[in-house]
């Protein structure tokens, strides 16, 4: 068994040459083979192969997504969502008081469309008017006019961010990136003192480090549809927050608590 090889036949030939040249000892090769065979024996793979149970039968897949499993998933989501802080006493949000919601999703991951559509649909069913953020076109070669504070205030009653920055192989960071050259536009949360703002992380529980100005912050740990549903239930006060953070969402920074 050779792991992480570029070409199996090539690596097998290298191993044979190493054995012939004395770089690889017979004892080391025997040890490696013994470990592999022992692992298979411990898992009873030979017996399962003989019994025809090495791979589950296709009909066993029917259990996936059954009512019991869905109930477990809903319970996990309900118990996981964590209110990290709400120092502005914003929650629960109300579809009358906070009717017009500017919605911004960050991450640009493959799941973004699904996540956004699920969250928007959940919120609209609760009676909110969801207004998705549209990236501005910046052309600094000519004079540009940006919204004034009062113009922004008059358009929105609430701003909701969703951090959907998924971890991936060879992805070296899971930080937030903004569509805001020189701090321009409405992607970066300059307006937290103007319009109530809440940040929800569906992946990385440490995003508060990148949005220290946000006063209401929620960690949900997963962008599964049922987790999104649970977040909306808690945002609107239909379910209480039960989650206990498994990490330090304040990243050891006292100022992030406020």
Regions found by a protein language model. Name each.
Residues 1-258:
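Preference for extracellular/luminal or secreted protein segments
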